[in-house]
A protein has these predicted regions:
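Conserved acidic residues
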Residues: 37, 150, 178-180
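Short, well-structured alpha-helical interface segments that form or flank functional binding sites
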Residues: 46, 50, 137, 141, ...
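Short loop/turn segments at strand-loop or loop-helix junctions that form parts
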Residues: 1-2, 69-70, 184-186
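A short acidic (Asp/Glu
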Residues: 51-53, 76-80, 192-195
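Glycine-rich dinucleotide-binding loop and its adjacent helix/turn
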Residues: 1-59, 65-66, 203-204
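Dinucleotide-binding/catalytic capping subdomain of oxidoreductase cores
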Residues: 56-163
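Glycine/Thr-rich phosphate-binding loops of Rossmann-like dinucleotide-binding domains
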Residues: 5-8, 75, 190-192
Length: 205
């Protein structure tokens, strides 16, 4: 498939940082977790979600996890995507629910509302309306775990990181003591220049 991958380990972050900041990518957090009191997870997508869940599963207190989310996302309910007999009615029912929601919607916003009402989509916080959908999938138990995090920083994209603060475009946020910053901000898949599927002797899938 003609697409480009973009993960924290192999790309330069879209923000700058001071040299004395304790910093790692999601790919290497297992090797660097020891010796810190707080963990600042930068990135609100699936990688950020999985990193927060991994920290919780490894007995880090929710109070010591600080999740920087530039934009909240609509999330797919995992039970609707399981190819197992136990989830047959959930998965097939979700397909019907999606078609019904799309057919009955009067706008894009209304469509997302209807998909949420039917249990197809989930969100982290009922008080915060998501503004993106990249297809990230979570279970209802994972969602409940994420909802135990009291410190979710919603100030847009990080511009610069120093030991004492995160700099955003319009504000700053004070860093907790002895914190490890975990970069989960890569977009995973990026768009490339459009190409014709059939071009002479070349086929681009």
């Amino acid at each position: 498939t003609y697409i480009n991958t973009n993960i924290p380990l192999t790309r330069t972050p879209c923000f700058t940082r001071d040299n004395d900041v304790a910093f790692t990518s999601a790919n290497t957090v297992v090797e660097n977790i020891e010796g810190f009191d707080n963990y600042v997870v930068v990135g609100g997508g699936k990688t950020g979600i999985d990193t927060c869940l991994w920290l919780l599963e490894n007995h880090v207190s929710p109070n010591n996890i600080h999740w920087v989310v530039s934009r909240d996302a609509w999330l797919l309910n995992r039970k609707n995507t399981q190819p197992l007999d136990d989830f047959f009615f959930d998965s097939i029912g979700a397909q019907a629910n999606q078609m019904e929601a799309i057919a009955a919607s009067t706008s894009i916003e209304d469509m997302f509302d209807k998909l949420e009402e039917r249990g197809v989509l989930l969100r982290i916080d009922k008080e915060v309306r998501p503004s993106m959908f990249h297809g990230a999938t979570v279970s209802e138990l994972e969602l409940k775990a994420l909802q135990t995090l009291p410190s979710i920083v919603r100030e847009g994209r990080v511009k610069h990181i120093s030991r004492d603060k995160l700099q955003f475009e319009n504000t700053t946020w004070s860093m907790p003591d002895n914190a490890l910053v975990i970069d989960c901000s890569a977009s995973a898949l990026t768009n490339l220049e459009m190409k014709a599927v059939f071009d002479g002797d070349t086929i681009t899938p």
